[in-house]
């Protein structure tokens, strides 16, 4: 029987004043549970919920893309033997807009993006179709176990 990975979580919500309803949907225990469900090894992660300006600045600085995106993952582990370490940055207004456009509950979209970002922190990617299909299948399975619907339907 495999053990549950340990998670050290630093939760930051500088966008709380502008997005209090988002913070209310994201209690520490829920965020930690969603991340732990997607962790395959011990992890030390910072999750930061930001506004559009900070999201855009980070995306422009680190990816060369001048717009806010839903989730950015910065993975720091240097080898597979290291604990999973990284920062997940979620942009509240982008997540809210996408959830509305996709007709899904905001909390379900946050859970999906936290699982998605956690997989990125472990080296999963979706740049080529085969990798995207694998990553989407893992996300769908994890979210199903957490009681959320398939995010790709």
Curated annotation (Swiss-Prot):
Tell me which residues bind Zn(2+).
116, 120, 126
Tell me, what is an example of a GO biological process annotation in this record? rRNA processing
List locations, semicolon-separated.
Answer: Cytoplasm
Cellular component (GO) terms are: cytoplasm
Q: Name one GO molecular function term.
A: RNA endonuclease activity
Q: Does the keyword rRNA processing apply?
A: yes
Q: What is its EC number?
A: 3.1.-.-
Q: Which cofactor does it need?
A: Zn(2+)
The main place the protein resides is: cytoplasm
Which InterPro entries does this chain map to? Answer: MetalPrtase_cat_dom_sf_prd, YbeY, YbeY_CS
Q: How is the cofactor bound?
A: Binds 1 zinc ion.
Q: Is Nucleotide-binding set as a keyword in this record? A: no
Kindly list any coiled-coil regions of this protein.
none
The source's domain of life comes to: Bacteria
Tell me which UniProt keywords the record has, alphabetically: Cytoplasm, Endonuclease, Hydrolase, Metal-binding, Nuclease, Ribosome biogenesis, rRNA processing, Zinc
Function text:
Single strand-specific metallo-endoribonuclease involved in late-stage 70S ribosome quality control and in maturation of the 3' terminus of the 16S rRNA.
UniProt similarity note? Belongs to the endoribonuclease YbeY family.
Query: What is this protein called in UniProt?
Result: Endoribonuclease YbeY
Taxonomic lineage of this organism? Bacteria, Pseudomonadati, Pseudomonadota, Betaproteobacteria, Burkholderiales
- State which gene encodes it: ybeY
